[in-house]
UniProtKB/Swiss-Prot annotation:
Subcellular compartments: Cytoplasm
Gene Ontology terms describing biological process: cytoplasmic translational termination
The name this protein goes by in its record: Ribosome-recycling factor
GO CC terms, sorted: cytosol
Gene designation per UniProt: frr
């Protein structure tokens, strides 16, 4: 494997780490209704556990209400139970083939918990980036040991790794600040 391939592979994994972090924090409640809130909800349907997205459509009705349109009427009760049991602090109400999910306002204590959770996810993502950096440098060490690259190329690889980690850590930090602002907004 060449130095370029090692760098490209590491950068692709770093991008995935940032995307994964973005997906995780999208599911953290803010004061507003967002469909991402129900992304992780799994419904017991047809003898298996399925994501809510495969059971029906989720839409935002207004700033504090989500509406779930269930495709199969027999799945309304199971879907309502799954939302209630998802530990999101939501109380869904079935209305025919739809389920109305009111998003209650967050109290100060809950907001602080969500900010702390966001920061924890951010720190986990940053740790993943640093591990990928270590992996990248290990690959460069191996190439140098096998006499495929020189010290200068290895030093450049280290510089590239540091720049990549810095770039993606900044993206994560910016996302944390933005999410914190959304959570604390009353």
């Amino acid at each position: 494997m060449s130095l370029r391939e090692i760098t490209q592979k590491a950068e692709a994994k770093m991008k995935k780490s940032v995307e994964s972090f973005q997906h995780e924090i999208a599911a953290i409640r803010t004061g507003k209704a967002t469909t991402a809130l129900l992304d992780h909800v799994k419904v017991d349907a047809y003898g298996q556990t399925m994501p809510l997205k495969q059971i029906g459509n989720v839409g935002v009705q207004d700033a504090h209400t989500l509406m779930v349109q269930v495709w199969d009427k027999s799945m309304v009760a199971a879907t309502e139970k799954a939302i209630r049991d998802a530990n999101l602090g939501l109380n869904p109400v079935a209305e025919g083939q739809s389920i109305r999910v009111s998003i209650p306002p967050l109290n100060e204590e809950r907001r602080k918990e969500y900010v702390k959770l966001t920061k924890k996810y951010g720190e986990d993502a940053k740790i993943a980036l640093r591990n990928l950096r270590r992996e990248m440098l290990h690959g460069a060490d191996k190439l140098e040991k096998d006499k495929e690259i020189g010290e200068d190329a290895k030093a450049n690889c280290k510089k590239d790794a540091d720049n990549l980690v810095h770039k993606y850590e900044k993206q994560i930090s910016d996302m944390i600040v933005q999410k914190e602002k959304e959570i604390m907004e009353v």
